Every structure is written in structure tokens, then in C-alpha cells.
UniProtKB/Swiss-Prot annotation:
Main location: other
Span list, region Polar: 2-45
Transmembrane segments: 43-63, 76-96, 97-117
Protein's name according to its UniProt entry: Oleosin 18.2 kDa
Its job: May have a structural role to stabilize the lipid body during desiccation of the seed by preventing coalescence of the oil. Probably interacts with both lipid and phospholipid moieties of lipid bodies. May also provide recognition signals for specific lipase anchorage in lipolysis during seedling growth.
């Protein structure tokens, strides 16, 4: 038997609705309502889209008919001129392929050469040496300008001092 403390615990209840399979009712999963017809918006949608769909279907039929007639007229010409057309098409295709492949090989060669030169430049460190050389030159130029500024200042000071000594 169940004890008293088990009776006070809340229980969870799961509800599973059951649907009828005869589909005559208005509710439930998969139920269809046979008593009412299509809505007004559905009727308007069908009436609007029916002429558009029919027109597109007619255009597709005309395109198919034109294609079949064109093939019927062109097939004898293709058969008669095939000894000339097939080799000409093959020659044109080979020429186009040759131009495209030569361009691709040229680009591949240029990119490979660029890659190798960049790798050699980084391996020998010429880029780092160039940067160090540029830094050293800027530093030397700064020192030179500072030295010249001091010399010019001393010359001006000496001339000013000579001018004062000559007056007295």
C-alpha cells in the first residue's frame, strides 16, 4: 500500500488528445472540412494565375515547335556540310585551347618567378639589410645636420663677437 507521504507529492498528468479518423469533424490532426468550399482569396488566386500559366505554357509549346522545325530544316545542311564543319570546329576549339593554355602557362611562370625571387630576397636578407642601411643613413644625416647647425651658430656668434670688439 502507498504510504501517507507519497500521497502529498504532486503528480504530473500527461494528456494525449485522440483524434477521429473519419475526417467528418472540423477539428483534429489531418481532419478536413468538407462542408465549406474554397475561400474567396483562393478563387481569386486561381482566376488570376490560370491565364498567366496558360500563356506561359503556350509560349513553351511554341518554342518547342520552333526548335523542332529548325532542327528539321538544319539537319540536312549539317549532314551535307559535316565533312567541313566538324574539322573546322575541332580546329577552332584547338586554337582557343592553345591560346588559353599559353596564357595560363605564362601567368604560372610569372607567379613562380616572383615567388622564387621573393624567397631568395628573404633568404639572403637583402630586404633587412636595405632597411638597416636606410636607418643608418637617416641617423647619419641627422647627425650631420646637427653638426652643421652648431657650426653655423658658432660662426654667427664669432662674427657678432668680432663686430662688438671692433666697435669698442
Amino acid at each position: 500500500m502507498a504510504e501517507v507521504r507519497d500521497r502529498n507529492l504532486p503528480h504530473q498528468v500527461q494528456v494525449h488528445p485522440q483524434y477521429r479518423l473519419d475526417n467528418t469533424t472540423g477539428g483534429g490532426y489531418g481532419a478536413k472540412n468538407y462542408h465549406s468550399g474554397p475561400s474567396t482569396s483562393q478563387v481569386l488566386a486561381v482566376l488570376t494565375l490560370l491565364p498567366i500559366g496558360g500563356t506561359l505554357l503556350a509560349l513553351a509549346g511554341l518554342t518547342l515547335a520552333g526548335t523542332v522545325i529548325g532542327l528539321m530544316l538544319a539537319t540536312p545542311l549539317f549532314i551535307i556540310f559535316s565533312p567541313v564543319l566538324v574539322p573546322a570546329a575541332i580546329a577552332i576549339a584547338m586554337a582557343v585551347t592553345g591560346f588559353l593554355s599559353s596564357g595560363a602557362f605564362g601567368l604560372t611562370g610569372l607567379s613562380s618567378l616572383s615567388y622564387v625571387l621573393n624567397r631568395l630576397r628573404y633568404a639572403t636578407g637583402t630586404e633587412q639589410l636595405d632597411l638597416d642601411h636606410a636607418k643608418r643613413r637617416v641617423q647619419d644625416m641627422t647627425e650631420y645636420v646637427g653638426q652643421k647647425t652648431k657650426e653655423v651658430g658658432q660662426k654667427i656668434e664669432n662674427k657678432a663677437h668680432e663686430g662688438q670688439v671692433g666697435r669698442t
